[in-house]
Amino acid sequence: LFFCSIFNFEFLIFNMSLREKFRGTGVAIVTAFNQDGSIDWHSFEKIINHIIEGKCEYIVVLGTTGESATVHGKEKQEVFSFVSKINAGRVALVAGIGGNDTHEVLEGFKTFDLKGYDAILSVSPYYNKPNQEGLFQHFKSLDAETPLPIIMYNVPSRTGMNVTGETQVRIARECKNIFATKEASGDFAQINYIIKNKPADFMVISGDDPITLQMIAAGAEGLISVVANAYPKDYSDMVRLCLAGKFEDAQKLHYKYLDIIASMFAEGSPSGVKAYLSEMGLCGNYFRLPVWKVSEKHHQKIRELMKGL
C-alpha cells in the first residue's frame, strides 16, 4: 500500500510537470529548405527564434508541417539536434516520431538521440487502416518502450482511420506514458466524449487552428498550431486568453485570423504557411516533392490578406 501511494504521488507530480510545460501553444514548426531541396539551416534558425520570441510554450519538430515524410534517417537526427542546439532550453521541445510500422517507430525510439527534448508526438498509423484494437495495441507497444512521455496524434483526414473517442480514452487509462492527445478529428461529439471520460491528468490538445477557441471552451488545454509559425505572438496570446476564461477578448484575435487560417490550408499545408513565411522573409518558398507551393493566384490572395492585418 505504501509503495502504491508513493508511485501514485510520483506519477501525479510527473503529470503536473507535463501540464505546466504543455498547457498553451505548441508550434508544429516547418522545415526550411533551399531551392535544391537541401535544408536551409540559416532560415530554420530564424523561424525557431521567431517562434520563441513570440512567447509560444513549445515547439514540435518533424511533424506533418515539418515535412517529416520526406526527411530521412541521419537527416532527421540532424534536425532534432539542430533545433535542440538553437533552442538552448528556452522552450519545451517535442520530437515527431510516428509511422505505420510499429517496429520501425520503436526502432526510432531506440536510435534517435533526443537530448533536449521533453516529449514525443506520435501520429496514429496511416494508410494500412488498422482496426481499433490494432490502433490500441500500437500505442500500447509505444507506451512500453518510449524514452519520453508521448502525445498521441489523431488526424483522420491524413491517416485514413479515426482513433475513436472510446479508443483514445482506453489509451489514456491504460498507457501511463501517453499523457495527451493532439485531437484533430474536427468531430465535436468525439472531442466532448474524450474530455468527459478521460482521466483527470490526461491532456486534450487541439490539432485544429480554426476551432481551438471552441475546443478550449469545451475543456481542451491548448493547441499545436500551424498558424503560429507565422503569427506566434497573437496566436499564443489568444490561447492564453482562452485558458484564462477571457473568451470575449480571445474572440477578437480568433476572428482577426479566421480568413488567414483558411488561406493557409486552402491549397494544402505546409504549402500555405510557407507562403506566409516567405513573404515575411523568414524562409524560401521551397518544399520536397510531392509537396508544392500554392498557385500564384492564391499567393496573391495571401499578400492581400497580410496587408489587411
PLM regions and their residue ranges:
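Catalytic alpha/beta core domains of metabolic enzymes, predominantly
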Residues: 144-145, 158-265
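C-terminal alpha-helical cap/extension of soluble enzyme domains
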Residues: 21-32, 50, 54-56, 65, ...
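Alpha-helix N-capping/helix-start residues
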Residues: 35, 41, 73, 165, ...
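Glycine-rich phosphate-binding "P-loop"
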Residues: 154-155, 177, 288-289
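Active-site beta->alpha loop and helix N-cap motifs at the rims of alpha/beta catalytic domains
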Residues: 18-160
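Short, basic, low-complexity termini and linkers enriched in Ser/Thr/Gly/Pro
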Residues: 5-15
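A general structural signal for well-ordered alpha-helical segments in protein cores
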Residues: 44, 76, 80, 105, ...
